[in-house]
């Protein structure tokens, strides 16, 4: 019962640059990449709710379908629409109920329900009228169910329900004396809010949140908890986001919901928290103060990916905040869970999300980088940087590069001992200019430490890390970047070469006979000092 996402949104809000502060190094989610995953995830849940739950799961009053819906049976039903319309518009309550129930069953068939045909029959205004029949809750329920399924279709279908004035009536039905009517109103409002941010705002502006939250209590049956949590997640989702003050009252209820053991409730409650935590630091702080972090971290060990993914997304959003907000998550015990996500057999999207989360922790202060080091995360991170699919490599590159930016001399030395140089060099030929820049910056930060060691007389007066870069074919790759289309990459490559390899180039020119033409740096004389294949600078 989850809804299609909004269009793919902004790029990373914070683009990492050498020497920037930690807030700039931290990255909000790059919606260009993740909205695709969201799209698949949410569309599949929408279909599952609309089709699967109708057919298989418990329904109010035990009202299910009357057996398999063959094409011939559906066609026969469609032929009966004129008679059904007569029943809906009759003055006999029993005829009204029977005809409305027939329409509801028609709208509940598993494959391609005939929503357009039902709308064309002109019965939607009558169904909305039936919502007000408090003397006949069974009729209210059947009309609400039919309208719910109309609203589950396209945006045009949802608009028909809205334009007939159903939304404020559904909001009133959230306080109905009938459990079944209340639950169907919850579902209907979830479908309307799920259509678009404008529809979501319309529902909220009719005052739906407070009576919806009232459905989420210890006396509610499981089907109500599931439906109401899903609807609540639709109230919180979408771009542009819901005005935060409007949905902030949901936080205490969400804190209670994430301690339940039902997978559906957990999934939708975690998605709601992921939407609420996606934004500026004041939103993140409100989520932290709601007391959800310890349980979210615990859910990173949940066996179901449908729960794990939104819990991880929320944790990842929280660590895009400031150092103190990141520290709160660290102290909640997140790092051992992130280690497990990197090293165990999880699917690609989870490993990618875990690397993204780590990259925002390594964008923090030295103590936070040290916590990542202490949790043993660097080695599996480097392994993914070297061997994983490109999408994971990109996030791992951010994580390592951020650590080189804010890390101490000793921490950067440790990164090198874990083998980070070669995979950073290998990514210099990747097609994503942002990642090339990130890797160049990481290598530059490493070279600075190697140079400092050299100036202190260590490593026989050699920049050991420059040597490792050469041995990893990194020097050739950096040299090739001098002809890169991206000006920032070109300038950074030139700067690195001039700072760390110009000395050797000058030596080569001198040994080549003093020819300083950089385009013709060849030795045309008989210089016995020149080995076959040119010089190797160690």
From Swiss-Prot:
Residues 1-58 form the IBB domain. One of its GO terms (molecular function) is nuclear import signal receptor activity. PROSITE patterns: ARM_REPEAT, IBB. InterPro entries: ARM-like, ARM-type_fold, Arm_3, Armadillo, Importin-a_IBB, Importin-a_IBB_sf, Importin_alpha. It is found in: Nucleus envelope. Forms a complex with importin subunit beta-1. Interacts with A.tumefaciens VirD2 and VirE2. This is Importin subunit alpha-4. It comes from Arabidopsis thaliana.
